[in-house]
Design a protein with these regions (language model features):
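A C-terminal cap/extension of S-adenosyl-L-methionine-dependent methyltransferases
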Residues: 200-254
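A short acidic, Gly/Pro-enriched loop at the edge of an enzyme's catalytic core
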Residues: 100-110
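Conserved class I S-adenosyl-L-methionine
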Residues: 1-50, 53, 57, 142-167
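A short glycine-rich, Lys/Arg-flanked "PGG" loop and its adjoining helix->strand segment in the class I
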Residues: 126-138
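Class I SAM-dependent methyltransferase SAM/SAH-binding core
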Residues: 53-98
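Short alpha-helix
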Residues: 178-195, 201
């Protein structure tokens, strides 16, 4: 976990989802599906809240939100934002592998939007999902973000074709430094095995990483047309693996 904390201490995570349109897609799509799937006035745990990209917006929409993150600097950032407009129910520093501060069946919705980017060990990945499931009410919703192995290969090969052996090794294992790349099928199988039934499995940013400059060059009207295309196709199982970021949305069965 120290390496993950070190990584995020060196990043400007607060700007990641707004830096350009290719990154904004991930945020817009994730919010679209949270709003689509969640009932109004839900009690939500944002267990990997980062710097608060989702928790504040969800609280403004009337949900009761508790936000936590592994990275102390991220939590401080959330606390500072919340002081300006107190709207979150609670804020905490914590590890997704241990949500023991919360009782079983506490939340209507649990968001795990980042932890699985970094957990290499399959037991840890299962533990994260099990903890999310434990604190979620029966028939409640669990949102799990993951990185896609196929898209990562395309991205790496596009910019670093001379490192093909390394790229292939990363593709076979899914591992690269502090990151782990999954596949849509792997994500579905793991969640299903743990009693989290699939509602949606979507590509949140599609292949936008392949043409960020073209997206930036679109007029507002053209960009709206692109968003329409993206939202129409983001659930297509034939192209899921070619989205850099995936989002599995499941329901707790028991």
């Amino acid at each position: 976990m120290d390496e993950i904390i070190k990584y995020y201490n060196a990043q400007n995570e607060d700007d990641r989802l707004t830096i350009d349109r290719s990154h904004e897609l991930e945020y817009l799509t994730t919010m679209r599906y949270i709003e689509k799937a969640c009932a109004s006035n839900s009690k939500i745990l944002d267990a990997c809240a980062g710097t608060g990209a989702y928790c504040f917006e969800l609280a403004l929409k009337g949900h009761k939100v508790i936000a936590g993150d592994l990275i102390p600097s991220n939590v401080k950032f959330i606390e500072m934002k919340n002081k300006k407009q107190p709207i979150l129910d609670n804020i905490y520093t914590g590890n997704i592998l241990d949500l023991s501060n919360f009782q079983d069946d506490s939340f209507d919705v649990t968001l795990c939007l980042g932890a699985l980017y970094h957990l290499h060990d399959m037991n840890d990945r299962e533990q994260a999902l099990l903890e999310c499931k434990r604190v979620t009410k029966t028939n409640g919703l669990i949102f799990v973000a993951y990185l896609n192995r196929f898209a990562s290969f395309m991205n790496n090969f596009t910019y670093h074709p001379d490192n093909f052996d390394t790229i292939m090794q990363e593709f076979r294992t899914g591992n690269k430094e502090v990151f782990y790349r999954s596949t849509p099928v792997e994500m579905e199988q793991q969640a299903s095995k743990l009693g989290i039934s699939k509602l949606y499995n979507i590509g949140t940013d599609g292949v936008a990483f392949m043409y960020p400059e073209q997206l930036e060059g679109l007029s507002k009207k053209q960009y709206e047309k692109y968003l329409e295309y993206h939202f129409d196709t983001c659930e297509d199982e034939h192209t899921l693996g070619y989205s850099l970021h995936g989002l599995y949305i499941g329901r707790k069965q028991h």
